[in-house]
Amino acid sequence: MDSIASIGASSGGHAGIEIMDIEGNRGYSIHGHDHFPMMSVFKFPIALYFLDQADHGKITLDETLTIKKKDWEKTFSPMLNKYKEDTIRITIRDLLIAIIQVGDNVACDVLLARAGGPPIVNAYIHSLGIAEIDIVVTETQMAADPKTMYDNWCSPAAMNALLQLFYQGHILSATNTALLLQWMTGAITGPHRLKGLLPASTIVAHRTGTSGTSPDGLSVATNDVGIITLPNGHHLCLTVFIMDSQAGEATREGAIARVAQLAYDTMSAGK
């Protein structure tokens, strides 16, 4: 898959790509151990933490947390836009669905506060044997100081390893593995990224991450990571991180889609 490198280069930024056919035990990597800003991709590890806590009886997904809308007026939150009242109570389950399916930033920071802060989630992910990742700042902190967007970083190899451990049932119970896969398959963000050029019927369980674009046209991060079900029944873990690109959104997203398409075609054919 040598042309994967040329697709990555076409993104206009620094591209990190990690591909693994789980059942076929075949992979491909470009800049697999470099550090890339995750943006909302870090909501996948947050979901793993809370579902693991539920598996061990430390929380229940039906526990409710209180949110005051006036505290979050400037924060991206499709979830809160559904409510007219200022003070609302939302279950951990619904907060997790919101971070996975729409990348809700309020839900993310409320969950991080409930966990005890980013370092708690970070330590949990490290305890799984995933070393090349740092989760140290909240969405609120990243919004206040854009330089901190680089502080929540992960290598493509580490993210793909985390995806594989999760999919193979080495992290969560069978019930919660299936639940998170269901939520990730229902994600509505990034339709033109991993899913963009695949057959419409393809099952893609994924989580995107996206920065804003600076006035001079720099996009810090355009990401998509996930698990793709192939026609031969195999499952493809795929991480694509694009960092510091000056290209337009269509170019960045198109590069991710082309990587996914080539990986899908190659691994499906057994090449």
Where are these regions (language model features)?
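Active-site SXXK
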Residues: N25, P37-L65, L238
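Soluble periplasmic/extracytoplasmic beta-strand elements of cell-envelope proteins
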Residues: G16-M20, S29, P45, T66, ...
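Structured C-terminal helix/loop/strand segments within mature extracytoplasmic catalytic/sensor domains
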Residues: M1-I7, G27, A113-R114, P118-P119, ...
